Amino acid sequence: FYAAYLAKTGIVHPMQNEILASQFQDPYMVARQLLAPTNRPIFYQKHMTQHMVDGVPRAWMAHVTNVFLIRHPARVVASYAKKREGPQLDDIGYRQQAELFDHVTSLGQTPIVVDSHDIRDDPAGMMRKLCDAVGLKWDAGMLHWPSGGHASDGVWASHWYGAVHRSTGFAD
């Protein structure tokens, strides 16, 4: 929903033109794409809650397993401010995250919530719990990865994902 968010709000972001050119700007087209068959048994999607502004469809959320990754606000603000000057409350996404959590709950689902602090403290234990919660087989290989980008990274990765691209595991 990144391009749809930028198109709707008019907020200026780094790499904006590349983002707008790379994705649907119509949030209904994005939602339709999220539910399209992928010919894979597992289809991981990462969404930034701040991109889920008013008018972004929510019905698709009833058809997926929703996991909310939370992080201490001070860490979020500090990280975001390194990449974009003068962040506002809605840039961080906490209000939207609460609304999305309430929406998922209203669907009769019990959303899974994972605190990033807990993952950093006990990566293996938390990843096992998360796998159990979403019905995936645990594999210790999930704890480490090669440094660098991933084929599924968006065009914005070079700006936003520097720390992730340098990491090789949760403790990095």
Question: In which residue ranges do the predicted regions lie?
Answer:
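Short aromatic-enriched loop/helix-cap "lid" or pocket-rim segments at secondary-structure transitions
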Residues: 5-10, 56, 79-81, 125-127, ...
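PAPS-dependent sulfotransferase catalytic domain
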Residues: 70, 74-143
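A mobile, often basic/glycine-rich helix-loop segment
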Residues: 66-67
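A polyampholytic, Gly/Pro-enriched intrinsically disordered region
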Residues: 15-22, 88-92, 159-169
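PAPS-dependent sulfotransferase catalytic core
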Residues: 1-38, 143-172
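Glycine-rich phosphate-binding loop used to anchor ATP phosphates in small-molecule kinases
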Residues: 32-55, 114
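Short, conserved loop/helix-junction motifs that constitute active-site signature segments
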Residues: 57-63
